[in-house]
Amino acid sequence: LLAIGGYRGVITFVSLFFNIAVFSISIILMSWGWDPVIVTFASCLIIAYITLFFQNGRNSKTFASFFAVLAVLLLLFALSYFMGYGAHLRGVNEIMKYEEEIARLSPDISINMAKIAVSMIITGLIGAAMDASIAVSSAVYEVYNNNRNLSLADLFMSGIHIGGDILGATVNTLYFACLGESLTLFILFRNYHYSVLEVINSKAFCQEFVDIVISCISCILVIPLTAFAISYILKNLNRFEKYLPDDDLFIELDELREGKH
């Protein structure tokens, strides 16, 4: 990381440790009986804050991405609840994966497994949502930096077009990640001659399918939200100057002001 990324690589490494610490604390809180959904929401916000602001600084790109990710989290928590409870997800696949390790342990961990399933879905999508969001905001920022006469609508459409290119790769990444994780499950279905209906009605398959669907929805939603947020910020820079001390545009403005004096 130091050789390739330099100072930014070191910051990335440090922020990774902070994120691991946040995740570890969230597991401890859940084991103490705290609501898994609330803990997951809070931990995802902290992870997003660390990843975006600590790693990349407080600028218009990270500011827009953070609020787009926040909006997506709020929307998808409701959707995850609906789909998770509607599909009767209970975290079965995660438990079955480690059946050998927990064979001698009691399965009664006094935690609502339906909420754990929702937490798993949200935790799985936060990374992909941040990736897509920061990619769109960075691209729109560069478009504006090279042509500051563009209107808010022009910048927004630039973000949508860029997001469309990003979306295909992101969705494929999510799909193949889930497919690779569930490869043994699909081999099991094949060897035991499961019918299509039996596969669809399998709780293990259903959980993986819901994970993919909600993660893809998060990436679809975050692109227009980020495109609008970054476009609005860039066309209303004076309103946000005090919140974005690390933005190159404001540093440039400060240098121009000092030059005039």
Question: PLM ranges: what are they?
Answer:
Residues 3, 7, 190-261:
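Hydrophobic alpha-helical transmembrane segments of membrane transport and translocation systems
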Residues 9-94:
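Transmembrane alpha-helical segments that form the functional core of multipass membrane systems
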Residues 68-69, 107, 111, 115, ...:
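Pore-lining and gate-forming transmembrane alpha-helices of multi-pass membrane transport proteins
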Residues 74, 78, 128-132, 166-171, ...:
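Hydrophobic transmembrane alpha-helical segments of multi-pass transport and channel proteins
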Residues 123, 127-128, 161-190:
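Alpha-helical transmembrane segments of helical membrane proteins, especially in multi-pass transport
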Residues 127-143:
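Short helical (or helix-break) motifs at transmembrane helix termini and adjacent helical loops
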Residues 152-164:
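Helix-loop junctions and hydrophobic alpha-helical segments within the transmembrane domains
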